[in-house]
Amino acid sequence: MASPNAMAAAVDPIWEDLEEEEEELEEEQFVLVELSGIIDSDFLSKCENKCKILGIDTERPIMQVDSYVFAGEYEDTLGTCVIFEEGVERVDPEGTDKTVLKYKCHTMKKLSMTRTLLTEKKEGEENIDGVEWLQMKDNDFSYRPNMICSFLHEHEDEAAGPASDKPVELEDQESQMKGSAEQTQEQEKVEHSEVEDPAPSGETPSEMESSVFMGTQDGNVSQNNQS
C-alpha cells in the first residue's frame, strides 16, 4: 500500500500541468475591420492574412498589415454583420471540392481604419504611447499638407502652368495674324485703287476720254480748214 506522501507526490505534477494549461489559454476575439487608403488590393493575400494589432481594447487601435499601418476607431454598422468560417468539403472521390461556410459570430460594431504614417519620436517630445495619432479624413489634407502631398501639388502647378498659358499665346497669335491680314487687305485695296485711277483727282475717265476726243476733232477741223 502506497503511503499518502507518495500519492501526493504523484498527484502534484498533474495539478501543475493543469495550472500551466490554464495560464496558457488565450482569449479569442473576432473583430470586423474596414480598411481604407489601400493602394494594392492584393496585399491581404500576399501577407497571408497575418496582422498585428496594438491596443485592440482601446478607443483608437493601431494595426499593421505587411508594410501598411492603419489607425482607426470603432463605429456602429448599418445592420448586423455575420462572420463565417470558410471551409472545404470533398463532395465525391473524384476530387470535386465544395466550399462550406460555418457560422462563427455576429456583431453590430466595426473597426473603421485608415492608412496612416508613423513618425519617430524625438527627444523632448511628450510620450503618446509610442505612437503619433493622425487625425485624417478622406480627401482632407489640411493636416500636414507639405509632408503628404506637396510634391503632387508642385507637379500639378507645373503641368497646369503651360496648359493655362497656351490658350493665351494662341489668342495673341491669332489676333496678330488677323491684324496683319487686315493690314495687307487694306494695302491691296489702296494699290488697286491707284492702278485703276491714275488720273488727277476730280476727273473721271469718261471726262478724260471726252477731252481727248474733242481735241482730235478740233485738230481735224483745223487741218480741213487749212486745206
Curated annotation (Swiss-Prot):
GO CC, any one term: nucleus
Keywords noted in UniProt: DNA-binding, Nucleus, Transcription
Note one Pfam family from the annotation.
TFIIIC_sub6
Offer an example of a GO molecular function term for this protein: DNA binding
Q: Which biological processes are named by the entry's GO terms? A: transcription by RNA polymerase III
* Compartment(s) of residence: Nucleus
The protein's matches in InterPro entries, at most eight in alphabetical order, are given as:
GTF3C6-like, TFIIIC_triple_barrel
Q: Where is the composition biased (Polar residues)?
A: 203-227
Region Disordered: which residues?
157-227
- Composition bias of kind Basic and acidic residues appears in 186-195
Q: Which family does it belong to?
A: Belongs to the TFIIIC subunit 6 family.
Describe its assembly: Part of the TFIIIC subcomplex TFIIIC2, consisting of six subunits, GTF3C1, GTF3C2, GTF3C3, GTF3C4, GTF3C5 and GTF3C6. Interacts with GTF3C4 and GTF3C5.
Q: What does this protein do?
A: Involved in RNA polymerase III-mediated transcription. Integral, tightly associated component of the DNA-binding TFIIIC2 subcomplex that directly binds tRNA and virus-associated RNA promoters.
Record-given protein name: General transcription factor 3C polypeptide 6
